[in-house]
Amino acid sequence: WLEWRTKNITDFMALARKEVKAANPRVSFGTYTGAWYPSYYEVGVNFASKNYDPGKDFSWATPEYKNYGYAELLDLYATGNYYTDITIEEYKKTNRSIWNETDSQAQSGTWYCVEGSCRHLRHILKGNKFIGGILVDQFYDNPAKLSETIEMNLRRSDGLMVFDIVHIISKNLWKEVEEGMKNGGSL
C-alpha cells in the first residue's frame, strides 16, 4: 500500500511537470509539503531525493519506497518548518511531542524543531534546494521567536516562505520580520 500510493503520487508529479514544461519551459514547477518526513508517508508523499534510502532510517520504509522520491522533479520546493522550538538545543530541553495535522500519532525527535528539520531535510533531499516555511500565528505570544525562526530558516534553508502575511499585518510584526531577515543575512 505504501509503495503503490507513493508511486502514484510520484508518477503524477512527473506527469504534471511534463505538462507544465510543455506549456512553458521557463515556468518553475514546485510544491509545498509539511516538513515532518518521518510521518509524511501516512499521506503517501515521498518528497525526498530518489538517491535517499529511507529504509536506513525508518522502519516503515519498504525496500522499494526509496524508488519514489520526487525531489529531482522540482524546481521549487517549500516546506513547513512549523515549530516553536527553533534550535536543537531548545528542543532537547523541552522534549515536546508534536502532533501535526497529517499525523496519526504524536511525533518526537530533532526533526521537530527548525534547526533539526533543516538539517534532516538537507540529508534526505541530497543537494536539492528547499525553502523553509514559517507559521506566523504560532508566535503571537512570543514575537521575539518569530525573528529567530525567520533567521534560522534563512540560514539553514534556501529561502523563506511566510504563512501568512495577514498575521504580520494584523499584529504589526514588521519589526520582528525585519530583525529576523537582518540576522538571517537577507537584509
Question: Over which residues does each language-model region extend?
Answer:
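Aromatic-rich peripheral "rim/lid" segments of glycoside hydrolase catalytic domains that contact
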Residues: 141-159, 163-187
